[in-house]
Structures are given as C-alpha cells and as structure tokens.
C-alpha cells in the first residue's frame, strides 16, 4: 500500500511547496493537490511546468486533484462552470501526470429526492467520464458523511458509480465519511474493490451520527472509528493501492507543518501496516 498526503492536513500551517519538500523528506509516495487554495497560491510564484519538473525529479508523485466541488444538481450556469473547471483540470492533470480528480457532491440546505440526486450524479459523471477518457484520468466520487450532502453514504455513492458503469469512474472511501453517516461495513465487504480508487484514512471523536464535522477528525487509531474493520474489508475485496491521510483539525494546524506530516505518517503506518505492507 502506497502512502499519500492530503493537503487538508496542513491547510493552515503550510503551502504546496513546503508540503512537497516535507513529504519527500519523510517518505510519502503521493500527494493530493488542493485545487481550491494551495495550488492557486503556488501558481502566483511558480508555473505548472515548475511543478511538473519537481515531480519528475523527486520520488513523490501527484495522485489526485482535490477537488471538483458540488458537481451535481446544479442549474445550467452552475453546470457549465463545472464542465469548464473540469476541462481545465484535465490540462493540469496532463501537465503534471495526475491520475485522479476527486469529485465532491453538492452540499445544500435544499431537500432533493434521492432519485433526482442519482440521475443528476450519473448524468454529470458520465459526461465527465467522456471528457476525461482521452487524458487517461479517472474520476473518484467522494461521498461526504454530512446530513446536508446530497450523496452521504457509501451505499448511495456505490449505486451511482455502478450505474455509471465506466472504468474511469469510481469512489473515494473516506473512513470519517463512512462512519459519520452510519454506512454499513457489510456493504463495503460486498463491494468490488476495483470501484474504489482512493482510500482516505482518519479517525474521529465519538459524536453521534449526523453530528460529526470535519473538525472532529483525529489521527488514525486515536478515535472511535473501527479502522480495523475498514482495512480488513478493503483487503478482503482486493483493494491495496493507496492510503491518503486527510485531517481538518484546527488543533493540528497549530503544529509545525513538519510535526503534522511526521505524525500523520506514523499514525497511518501504525494502523495500516497490520493489514498491508507499506
């Protein structure tokens, strides 16, 4: 299992340049690049070609652009903006050699029936699949374990991906999101491991279903999530690609970037190495 760093983990105490240097120093294999803040900040003083050269001359490689946000159930203007943004991402992926784009479903106070959510998600993901295919890029749908997210359980996301039925459309499995809205471990055990593209590891304080927010995340192995169950299920269904550590805890943003990156690796390896060689 390869080790990846998700830049949310140092959102307020680092930048892309420093994340790369420290992840390279501490033996990470991949990085997920945040396209909404850290990449634009980097591009103020550097070019995409500079970034591509860094990846070509170092061990660490780009795993994913994170993320295409709120892709489904948009009005015409919103949909057109999503398509334009995604096409730009494809060019970035081509320049940098990025394998995946993470797609995050709409979060809204508006109540939308599940059938409408599914239809829109399937339609848009199919359109994105067509755009991504010539680039060799895959789309990883990340359900979000929050009541206001239109796709908030593993079961709902898996059904959408199965309906799309494209080799370049799969899932992000995030342990926090899986736990936060009570997704069923039996559903994961019955899933096709090839449909899971990226595994996000994290843990959480022990709040009830529906109350958890990203700030409640803690280092892997230090919270209430049954990570052993998640990892053993992933092993059972044949997933062994990449584990990406992703936290959003304000307390951890007070650490130095190096402390956070080192601790993220140690806690992740301690938990994952019981099931996978790293």
From Swiss-Prot:
Binds 1 divalent metal cation per subunit. Can use Mn(2+), Fe(2+) or Co(2+). Keywords: Cobalt, Iron, Isomerase, Manganese, Metal-binding. One of its GO terms (molecular function) is isomerase activity. SUPFAM superfamilies: Xylose isomerase-like. Pathway: Polyol metabolism; myo-inositol degradation into acetyl-CoA. Its EC number is 5.3.99.11. The keyword Iron applies. It catalyses: scyllo-inosose = scyllo-inosine. Its cofactor is Mn(2+); Fe(2+); Co(2+). A divalent metal cation binds at residues 142, 174, 200, 246. The keyword Iron applies. Involved in the reversible interconverion of 2-keto-myo-inositol (2KMI, inosose or 2,4,6/3,5-pentahydroxycyclohexanone) to 1-keto-D-chiro-inositol (1KDCI or 2,3,5/4,6-pentahydroxycyclohexanone). Belongs to the IolI family. This is Inosose isomerase. It comes from Bacillus subtilis (strain 168). The lineage of its organism: Bacteria, Bacillati, Bacillota, Bacilli, Bacillales.
């Amino acid at each position: 299992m390869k080790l990846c760093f998700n830049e949310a983990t140092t959102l307020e105490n680092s930048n892309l340049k420093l994340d790369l240097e420290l992840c390279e120093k501490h033996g990470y294999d991949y990085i997920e690049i945040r396209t909404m803040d850290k990449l634009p900040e980097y591009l103020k003083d550097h070019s995409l070609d500079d970034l591509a050269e860094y990846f070509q001359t170092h061990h660490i490689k780009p795993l994913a652009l994170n993320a295409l946000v709120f892709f489904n159930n948009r009005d015409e203007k919103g949909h057109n903006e999503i398509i334009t943004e995604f096409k730009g991402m494809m060019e970035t992926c081509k320049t940098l050699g990025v394998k995946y784009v993470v797609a995050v479903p709409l979060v809204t106070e508006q109540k939308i029936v599940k059938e409408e959510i599914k239809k829109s998600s399937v339609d848009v993901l199919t359109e994105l699949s067509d755009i991504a295919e010539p680039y060799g890029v895959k789309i990883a749908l990340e359900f979000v374990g929050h009541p206001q997210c239109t796709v908030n359980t593993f079961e709902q996301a898996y059904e959408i991906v199965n309906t799309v039925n494209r080799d370049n459309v799969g899932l992000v499995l995030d342990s926090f999101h899986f736990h936060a809205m009570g997704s069923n471990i039996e559903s994961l055990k019955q899933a096709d491991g090839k449909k899971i593209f990226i595994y996000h590891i994290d843990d959480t304080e022990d709040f009830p279903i529906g109350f958890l927010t990203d700030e409640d995340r803690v280092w892997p192995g230090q919270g209430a999530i049954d990570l052993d169950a998640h990892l053993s299920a992933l092993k059972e269904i044949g997933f062994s690609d990449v584990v990406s550590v992703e936290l959003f805890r304000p307390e951890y943003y007070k650490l130095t970037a190096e402390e956070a990156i080192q601790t993220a690796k140690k806690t992740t390896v301690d938990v994952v190495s019981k099931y996978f060689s790293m």
